[in-house]
Amino acid sequence: MSTTASTPSSLRHLISIKDLSDEEFRILVQRAQHFKNVFKANKTNDFQSNHLKLLGRTIALIFTKRSTRTRISTEGAATFFGAQPMFLGKEDIQLGVNESFYDTTKVVSSMVSCIFARVNKHEDILAFCKDSSVPIINSLCDKFHPLQAICDLLTIIENFNISLDEVNKGINSKLKMAWIGDANNVINDMCIACLKFGISVSISTPPGIEMDSDIVDEAKKVAERNGATFELTHDSLKASTNANILVTDTFVSMGEEFAKQAKLKQFKGFQINQELVSVADPNYKFMHCLPRHQEEVSDDVFYGEHSIVFEEAENRLYAAMSAIDIFVNNKGNFKDLK
């Protein structure tokens, strides 16, 4: 299955992290950090003179899946740049009921400056990209979740004091990220994102649940050129050993509720708890993109001193700002950012 879309050469979309060069992804994270600093410092003059670049324009949010963090962060980021966010839920528009993707995309993209699309299938993202006249930002599909990856790497570099200058020079951080759980859209982007920063990745999934082959192939290439390691296992203790970052996600994704009991049985023993963190680095950090359920991580880990989940959630705002700035304000050009 193709993960890329055929679009006009002058138009760039954010579909997945694997579509970006290492340098481009690092710039996205660096830009997110920049906007966080501006936002936190409340630099009013800087904000008014440099950031209201979309005043009088509209950013559409076409969401066919429910959302908390993605909707709030996207609307907040649009407002930061002076744009009017327009939320279009599945009950608000004709998409998929009385109107095709082609017709919807042609109409909506003619009236807005960008479309954030949160959809069920990756093919739906590609359909938007194929016919849109404005940038499409993938806000989640069943294959990828790039905004979460930008946010996660921002959270990691802040907590481990990673220098982007050193990363760009090939100086490896020697960090290890361990993922315990499902082979899903979040880890598809996060593993590539970590490897682009030279962070080694170990992924533990239950037997019978495997990473997509195209993601594995790409991960191996990115790991090799950045001096990192990439490991797949079904042994969570092995994956967690000496890990600096422990990460999990929901075991039952949206749309899989019908199979909840079967999936929970399959994931028995994959909870991140004291047994797993006991073999991790003593200064480990725990991450989760939320919402969280008890079977995924114990309360003492989730709410413990090593957890950075709420900082991670806040960083979704700055990830959205970075995406808008580069793909809308700067028309997909990663150079000459102001």
UniProtKB/Swiss-Prot annotation:
Protein EC: 2.1.3.3
Main location: cytoplasm
Keywords: Acetylation, Amino-acid biosynthesis, Arginine biosynthesis, Cytoplasm, Transferase
Annotated residues for binding of carbamoyl phosphate: S67, T68, R69, T70, R118, H145, Q148, C289, L290, R316
Binding annotation for L-ornithine: N185, D249, S253, M254
One Gene Ontology biological process: arginine biosynthetic process via ornithine
Pfam families (alphabetical): OTCace (PF00185), OTCace_N (PF02729)
Pathway membership: Amino-acid biosynthesis; L-arginine biosynthesis; L-arginine from L-ornithine and carbamoyl phosphate: step 1/3
Entry's localization field: Cytoplasm
Catalysed reactions listed for this entry: carbamoyl phosphate + L-ornithine = L-citrulline + phosphate + H(+)
Effect of E256Q: Reduces activity by 50%
Misc. comment: Present with 1140 molecules/cell in log phase SD medium.
Record-stated family: Belongs to the aspartate/ornithine carbamoyltransferase superfamily. OTCase family.
Name of the protein: Ornithine carbamoyltransferase
Native source species: Saccharomyces cerevisiae (strain ATCC 204508 / S288c) (Baker's yeast)
Classification of source organism: Eukaryota, Fungi, Dikarya, Ascomycota, Saccharomycotina
